[in-house]
């Protein structure tokens, strides 16, 4: 079953300077997201990854083409309807927010009862489960502004899980996490995907994270689809060397059999 679809999507920022000879941040992008899959979006800087997130969040709308979730155009949804379907975990959560962790995570429940002013026992239970799953339950009464970057990242993920979306969009989810929490984050995402059937879109510069976690990958370059396929099909030495402009080698992880990308560093 298809959860979301991009169909011939172009996007250009108004009055923006042309990038690399063309004004489009995305051009002719088409792909489907299947229910329950983990889908990675890769590409160098200025490839269009952030624009894709902004389109899914409806911060901006396509210049041409359509984006649908559950067969409904994003432009036809109310904000509450959109938030019940899609949750976005940004790369950076603003510092200095005047909320406790519990209060911020409970905000993920607002789309389910936009006219309700008080949390129900069910809301509290869902929020507690989300905090426990992300390892921030012991920080529930702490102010978000005093947390470390890694802790704020896990709180943002907890809020998204409390939203109970059909589609979870993650922008560099391990960017502020140490090695231990990177491993735990990947394990959590796999568990959410497996137990809840949540479709996950992972936007990342980390080719190896995407290769280890994702069922399919979309590689963008200059706003266009360079390749769409399995990690084995997309993480190709010749293709990556061309797109990223540096020599790489691709081997197999001895434990998982998944492709691993290594850069030929110069001394």
Predicted regions and their residues:
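The feature captures the beta-strand-to-loop junction immediately N-terminal to the Walker
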Residues: 42-44
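Helix-to-loop junction immediately C-terminal to a conserved catalytic motif
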Residues: 57
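Conserved ABC transporter NBD signature motif
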Residues: 65-73, 82
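Conserved ABC ATPase signature
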Residues: 117, 143-147, 151
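Conserved catalytic motifs of ABC-family nucleotide-binding domains
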Residues: 164
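Catalytic Walker B motif of ABC-type/P-loop ATPase nucleotide-binding domains
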Residues: 168-172
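ABC ATPase nucleotide-binding domains
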Residues: 243-267
């Amino acid at each position: 079953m298809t959860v979301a679809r991009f169909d011939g999507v172009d996007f250009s920022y108004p009055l923006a300077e042309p990038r690399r000879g063309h004004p489009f941040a995305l051009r002719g992008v088409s792909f489907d997201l299947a229910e329950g899959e983990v889908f990675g979006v890769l590409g160098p800087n200025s490839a269009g990854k952030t624009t894709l997130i902004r389109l899914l969040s409806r911060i901006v709308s396509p210049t041409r083409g359509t984006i649908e979730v559950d067969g409904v155009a994003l432009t036809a949804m109310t904000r509450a309807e959109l938030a019940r379907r899609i949750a976005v975990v940004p790369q950076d959560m603003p510092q200095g927010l005047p909320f406790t962790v519990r209060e911020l995570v409970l905000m993920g429940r607002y789309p389910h009862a936009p006219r309700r002013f008080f949390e129900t026992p069910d809301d509290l239970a869902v929020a507690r489960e989300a905090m426990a799953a992300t390892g921030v339950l012991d920080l529930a009464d702490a102010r978000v502004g005093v947390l470390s970057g890694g802790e704020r990242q896990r709180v943002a993920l907890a809020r998204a899980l409390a939203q109970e979306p059909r589609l979870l969009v993650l922008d560099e989810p391990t960017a502020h996490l140490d090695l231990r929490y990177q491993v735990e984050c990947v394990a959590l995402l796999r568990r959410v995907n497996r137990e809840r059937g949540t479709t996950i879109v992972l936007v990342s510069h980390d080719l190896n994270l995407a290769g280890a976690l994702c069922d399919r990958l979309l590689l963008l370059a200059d706003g266009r689809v360079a390749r769409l396929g399995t990690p084995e099909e997309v993480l190709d030495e010749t293709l990556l060397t061309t797109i990223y402009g540096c020599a790489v080698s691709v081997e197999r992880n001895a434990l998982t059999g998944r492709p691993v990308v290594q850069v030929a560093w110069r001394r």
